[in-house]
Amino acid sequence: MDIMEFLKTRRTYRRFEQKPVEPAIAREIMEAARIASCGANRQTLKYVLVQSPEMVAKMQPLVHWAAYLPPEQGQPKPDETPVLFVAVCQDESLPGCNDTDTGLALANMTDAAWAHGVGSCIMGAIDRPAIKELLGLGGNLRLHSVVAFGYPTHKSHLVAMQNGNVKYYLDDARDYCVPKRPMEEILLKTL
């Protein structure tokens, strides 16, 4: 698969098989985060890998899915939940914490996962205080986001945006349709 096809299919996935992500793949996802580019090589990010079924189950009610969809459509059913989470933290005791570095690490993790057919969902709609307590995070660690991982049970397609509507939706097969703006709208000029 060429890089553009890879990027078009490495979308957000929200329903998963109940099959564990192999330890070597989980480790590779974390290695991808570790080696991500970062400003001034500061390396301010820290992670918690949540993979035991008990802890994954405790995380599930603390994350919120698919804000554009009604819960009965967007919320994974008990047999569709992720099998692994990664909590992404910014260590504010280190200089230079920023969201750009966090975004680079998130992209590395989700790309590394997708190279093995593991889908992901980067989540910002989370119960930060409860997750920090559950994971024993304190001090200078700011919980930025959580990433859900698993083998997807649905597809996700890019579609042309209609009337400026950015809201994703489900088609008749319960696959996600994700509207994207046309190139003419996002490329301001070529000089």
Functional labels for PLM-detected ranges:
Residues 1-191:
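Acidic, surface-exposed loops and disordered segments
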